[in-house]
Design a protein with these regions (language model features):
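Positively charged, low-complexity/disordered segments
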Residues: 121-132
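N-terminal phosphate-binding loop and flanking beta/alpha elements of the actin-like ATPase fold
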Residues: 1-36, 41-119
């Protein structure tokens, strides 16, 4: 059973897998360990997550949202195009993106993803360095 850890951050998120007693960072589809916690909706209704969404913050601010994690549990919603999303829904899109990247990187299906802020987040962050 493959289990990954996810550090869901306000600005960036990342995933890791435990192998041989160590946390191994999982690169996203763009080769980076950090995935921006940003979601955007194209004009035709397609949802985009991560770096491509972040790239749209300037060109499509009305269809792109970031920093939504801090509003989880408040009931605040964000409008992308014609649809409204709760921060929990937007966060789930970021998590789904990291799980898909992990499946592609590891070549196997992910059966469980855990986001335990203190334990998993600390371990993932301790393995991350801007020099990777």
């Amino acid at each position: 059973m493959t289990v990954i850890g996810i550090d869901l951050g306000t600005t960036n998120s990342l995933g890791c897998v435990y192998r041989n007693g160590k946390a191994e960072l999982i690169p996203n589809a763009y080769g980076s360990y950090l995935t921006p916690s940003v979601v955007s909706m194209t004009e035709d209704g397609k949802l985009i997550v991560g770096q491509p969404a972040k790239d749209r913050l300037i060109t499509h601010p009305e269809r792109t949202v970031s920093s939504f994690k801090k509003d989880m549990g408040t009931g605040r919603s964000w409008k992308l195009g014609e649809k409204s999303f709760l921060p929990e829904e937007l966060s789930s899109l970021v998590i789904r993106s990291i799980v898909e990247d992990a499946q592609n990187y590891l070549g196997e299906e992910i059966e469980e993803a855990r986001s335990e802020e203190r334990r998993v987040g600390k371990e993932c962050r301790s393995r991350w360095s801007p020099y990777h």
